[in-house]
């Protein structure tokens, strides 16, 4: 920060803590054993207090793996003193087949609208803030997923307009 850094992106920050009792999971995935644990909020609050929270000009964004709206609100509500905003991936799972992001199946437009609307309403209601995006290093490109080739130009403009008209901070990639 002394060298002029004005922002930090924390990759999968919501999985930096787990229960110490090491119970067995009740399902094959086990994400509930290490995702969004209460200690994660404690860690981020401490990091905020001791580092980036000392300066109002610092922006922080946390990438959230398999999270919930409730947790994104906690992570990004200024009253909680954790992060400025969060990335979530729920809207990008509308074309997954059996949980596989590289399946290239047609996306569910109605589900996409439902997810975007639900997250927008709930995050605003809870006082949180969202990082808005279509692309990142972990996902196939949005233009290939959500658009037909013959409408590439029009669809690109539509995708850009969509994230710029939602409540949150748009991130542009590729």
Task: Describe the residue ranges of each PLM region.
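Active-site and adjacent substrate-binding regions of carbohydrate-active enzymes
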Residues: 1-174
């Amino acid at each position: 920060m002394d060298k002029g850094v004005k922002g930090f992106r924390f990759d999968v920050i919501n999985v930096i803590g787990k229960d110490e009792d090491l119970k067995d999971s009740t399902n094959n995935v086990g994400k509930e054993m290490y995702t969004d644990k209460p200690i994660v909020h404690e860690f981020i609050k401490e990091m905020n207090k001791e580092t980036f929270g000392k300066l109002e000009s610092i922006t922080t964004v946390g990438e959230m793996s398999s999270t919930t709206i409730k947790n994104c609100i906690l992570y990004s509500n200024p009253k909680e003193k954790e992060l400025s905003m969060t990335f979530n991936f729920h809207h990008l799972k509308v074309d997954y087949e059996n949980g596989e992001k590289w399946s290239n199946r047609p996306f569910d437009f109605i589900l996409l609208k439902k997810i975007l609307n639900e997250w927008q309403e709930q995050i605003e209601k809870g006082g949180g803030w969202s990082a808005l995006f279509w692309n990142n290093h972990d996902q196939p490109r949005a233009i290939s997923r959500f658009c037909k080739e013959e409408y590439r130009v029009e669809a690109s403009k539509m995708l850009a307009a969509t994230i710029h008209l939602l409540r949150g901070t748009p991130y542009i990639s590729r």
